[in-house]
């Protein structure tokens, strides 16, 4: 089979563990036909094949955001309080408003190189699953959507989960399990800590968390074969979540069968990250989180709440990677809006927005590790690694192209890069104007 499109670049990142290289990615029939070094072989070139010369632009698997909240983004867009859960059914049930908003949402994410997301939906998602079903059947989705049910108005509904799992088996929409919050923000004394807050010697958490109820819910979901994501910020919360996961179904090597995850992991105990790696629990980290904080204010908060001795373990992704924790990336959108180069600035460089002085540099990832988390790690978290997440023969042609070489650009300069081309199933869903001449007729309407 000859290729429809061949992408040529001096920076091909396959996310398979190989170093980026100069080569090509050949695409045909919505799939990756071949990936290789140097020039593409003659057999790939047919009479209709278009070759796109990309120079040193990074060619990567499409990016996966494993923690998004479309409902919150839509509520903000139309001026509704996203924290008021009672607003969500009316919002999601209003087709006249929600359909154009979701199209805008997909376009926004595609323009940032994102090709797949995991969405949080309260309870039964207020009927939004029906819209996703309709759009998938009509081939109108440019974004793969796995969604989770977060019990808010009623208890976890396993019957709903089974129905959604049976209903969504296509290429674009899947049901991914259940999600729940545990503790809250350390800045509000609501993060659950192993030792008391420095500013409140008798306080380890201002919230009354029903850990027994959370454990029962997770075990019930696990026994039914569903994944669970638990949001935890403080070191005690992370430890308690791991205690729960250790009671779940595991394989012969002791790793979780249902790929449960922990979201956020702001402040952790290194010993627990080792436990996490042994369990195979997935970390859903927020690599851009420093971008919404000012250095002086954030460090003052850490100093006042837990002290800088414990503060050494803030955002400790280095220990996660070294402990074998599967890493994936999220934004808690609309808290953050996906910007992969900015995530390199923050999670590789360790920088806050206003300066180039790293914080906890010893806890940072390499650019290759972070890009792998955004791609292969995200696909693994969605249980779709057999068809997404890497540039390999036979996989779906979900591809993102960045405006430069993200691996040779210093982390402090990474914010100058951006997505210039995004493909989903080999179809162009975004192209920046600067790429028009390079692409020629390859992506003509």
Place the predicted regions along the sequence by residue.
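Short, structured coil segments at secondary-structure junctions
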Residues: 45-47, 279, 323
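His/Asp/Glu-enriched, well-ordered alpha-helical/loop segment
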Residues: 219-228, 236-260, 265, 274, ...
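A structural microfeature
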Residues: 33-34, 421, 430
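Divalent metal-binding segments
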Residues: 2-160, 176, 180, 185-237, ...
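Acidic (Asp/Glu)-rich catalytic clusters
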Residues: 135-138, 163-170, 255, 276-278
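Phosphate/diphosphate-binding loops
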Residues: 142-178, 259-270, 301-326
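Short glycine/threonine-rich loop-to-helix capping motif typified by GTGT followed
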Residues: 125-139, 269-279, 401-404
């Amino acid at each position: 089979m000859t290729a429809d499109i061949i992408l040529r670049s001096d920076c091909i990142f396959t996310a398979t563990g190989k170093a980026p290289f100069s080569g090509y990615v050949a695409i045909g029939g919505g799939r990756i036909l071949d990936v290789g070094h140097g020039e593409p072989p003659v057999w790939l070139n047919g009479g209709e094949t278009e070759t796109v010369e990309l120079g040193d632009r990074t060619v990567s698997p499409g990016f996966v955001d494993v923690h998004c909240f479309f409902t919150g983004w839509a509520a903000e867009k139309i001026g509704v309080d996203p924290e008021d859960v009672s607003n969500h059914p009316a919002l999601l049930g209003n087709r006249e408003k929600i359909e154009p908003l979701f199209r805008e949402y997909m376009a926004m994410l595609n323009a940032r190189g994102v090709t797949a997301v995991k969405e949080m939906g309260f309870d039964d998602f207020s009927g939004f699953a029906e819209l996703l079903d309709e759009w998938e059947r009509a081939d109108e989705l440019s974004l793969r959507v796995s969604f989770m049910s977060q019990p808010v108005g009623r208890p976890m509904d396993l019957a709903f989960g089974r129905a959604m799992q049976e209903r969504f088996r296509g290429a674009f929409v899947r049901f991914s399990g259940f999600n729940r919050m545990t503790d809250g923000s350390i800045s509000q004394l609501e993060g659950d800590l192993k030792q008391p807050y420095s500013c409140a010697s008798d306080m380890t958490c201002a919230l009354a968390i029903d850990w027994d109820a959370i454990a029962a819910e997770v075990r019930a979901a696990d026994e039914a074969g569903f994944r669970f994501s638990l949001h935890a910020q403080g070191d005690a919360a992370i430890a308690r979540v791991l205690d729960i996961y250790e009671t779940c179904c595991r394989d012969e090597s002791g790793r979780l069968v249902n790929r449960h995850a922990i979201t956020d992991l702001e402040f952790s105990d290194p010993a627990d990250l080792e436990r996490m790696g042994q369990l195979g629990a997935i970390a859903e980290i927020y690599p851009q989180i420093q971008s919404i904080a000012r250095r002086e204010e954030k460090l003052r908060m850490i100093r006042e709440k837990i002290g800088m001795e414990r503060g050494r373990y803030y955002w400790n992704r280095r220990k996660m990677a070294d402990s074998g924790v599967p890493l994936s990336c999220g934004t808690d959108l609309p808290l953050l809006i996906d910007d992969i180069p900015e995530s390199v600035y923050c999670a590789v460089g360790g920088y806050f927005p206003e300066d180039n002085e790293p914080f906890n540099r010893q806890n940072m990832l390499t650019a290759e590790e972070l890009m792998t988390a955004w791609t292969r790690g995200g696909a693994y978290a969605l249980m779709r690694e057999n068809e997404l997440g890497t540039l390999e023969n036979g996989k779906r042609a979900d591809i993102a192209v960045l405006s430069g070489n993200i691996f040779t650009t210093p982390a402090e300069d990474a914010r100058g890069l951006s997505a210039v081309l995004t493909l989903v199933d080999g179809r162009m869903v975004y192209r920046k104007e600067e790429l028009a001449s390079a692409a020629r007729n390859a992506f003509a309407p």
